[in-house]
Amino acid sequence: MTTIELQIQDNTFLRQFETKVGNYLAKIEYSLQERKIFLTKLIIPEEIRDDEFRESFIKAVLHHIEENNLRVVPTSPQIASFLRRNKQYKELLPVGIRI
């Protein structure tokens, strides 16, 4: 699988991570509480929705979160499923959270 390079924007006003592909906007909505970020909803337009894009988008957002020393609480089923399949991100989970 090839990795797609994405530019991630943290839209703090709308509380969502965004990336634009052509005329389409993919986003992950979040809620920030102390040093934890709750990833609540993954929205990818149907026109750009595929497994490779979804994986690359989630990885890019997790990298951004890691750079900002935050912990991830995945309340979105799609993001929780990604974290279950990709154990290398388990250090981003807060103490006591298992998925």
Where are these regions (language model features)?
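Non-catalytic substrate-recognition and accessory regions of acyl/acetyltransferase enzymes
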Residues: M1-R49, H64-V73, A80, I97-I99
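Conserved active-site alpha-helix within GNAT-family acetyltransferase domains
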Residues: P77-I97
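Conserved acetyl-CoA-binding loop-helix of GNAT-fold acetyltransferases
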Residues: R49-H63
